[in-house]
A protein has these predicted regions:
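N-terminal Rossmann-like NAD(P)+-binding domain of SDR-like oxidoreductases, especially those catalyzing
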Residues: 1-170, 224, 243
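NAD(P)-dependent short-chain dehydrogenase/reductase
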Residues: 124-127, 149-225, 237-242
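Conserved metal-phosphate-binding beta-hairpin within the catalytic cores
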Residues: 234
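His-Asp-centered acyl/peptidyl-transfer active-site segments
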Residues: 228-230
Length: 245
């Protein structure tokens, strides 16, 4: 959705991909806007990795971007317990490497970090805001909080236009099938087609703030379009239980 929005404005978009990112590349190729832009040379994909600072330094020097949207990293809570070091390397230290590449090569670039509501842990107040105390309870949230603090440090220490969106859940048909919203939608479709008889889920009581992914893209663009870099909570302000879904 972000690439589509930028391309629709006539922007030139550069994306970072890994050698193993075949699924993501195929999804981009399937989108008419992206496929046409790629053919016209306005969408360019580059091999790089958040664990490799030299590749990030080279890419930033070559592209000289006006804006950077940092959405990459290991972002699944359960996986972060299975792969805590990898989560820290990509989600936490990957942000450090990217900020350093910006500071050293393109300090005028506007930088957006996709942070997460997971940093609030089990908050005592609802709804949460930019001033709600943070207390992460999983490795993914801890890595994102480190990344968020780095954004604030680099903004203050080096004067970078570095800002973050503290994002609550945002859903779409493009969401990975290992997330509960897609599990429910996919399960319902398969039952309707007679391919399955039952849908098995865990506890139905957790409440989440679920929003529409394209709306969050508008929020990201607004954060970088602001006069000054600040961090903002992006959410709908309404929660629903899994059972409601």
């Amino acid at each position: 959705y972000l690439a589509e929005a930028l391309l629709a404005e006539g922007r030139e978009v550069h994306g970072l991909v890994r050698q193993a990112s075949l699924v993501q590349r195929s999804r981009l190729d399937a989108l008419p806007t992206c496929a046409e832009a790629k053919a016209a040379g306005r969408l360019k994909l580059h091999y790089a990795d958040l664990t490799d600072s030299s590749s990030l330094q080279w890419l930033v020097r070559q592209v000289q971007p006006g804006e950077i949207y940092h959405l990459a990293g290991q972002s699944h809570v359960k996986v972060s317990f299975d792969l805590p070091e990898y989560t820290a390397q990509t989600t936490g230290l990957g942000t450090l490497r990217l900020l350093e590449a910006i500071r050293q090569n393109v300090p005028g670039t506007r930088f957006f970090l996709a942070a997460t509501s997971e940093i609030f842990g089990e908050p005592s107040e609802s709804p949460q805001s930019e001033t709600t105390p943070v207390a992460p309870v999983n490795p993914y949230a801890a890595a994102k909080l480190y990344a968020l603090n780095l954004v604030r440090v680099y903004r203050r220490a080096y004067g970078l236009f570095a800002a973050a969106g503290i994002l609550f859940n945002h859903e779409s048909p493009r969401r990975g099938e290992n997330y509960v919203t897609r599990k429910i939608a996919r399960g319902a479709a398969r039952i309707a087609r007679g391919l399955e008889r039952e849908l098995h889920l865990g506890t139905l009581t957790p409440r989440r703030d679920w929003g529409w992914a394209p709306d969050y893209v508008q929020g990201m663009r607004a954060v970088l379009g602001a006069e000054r870099p600040e961090d903002y909570v992006l959410a709908t302000g309404r929660t629903h239980a899994v059972a409601d879904f």
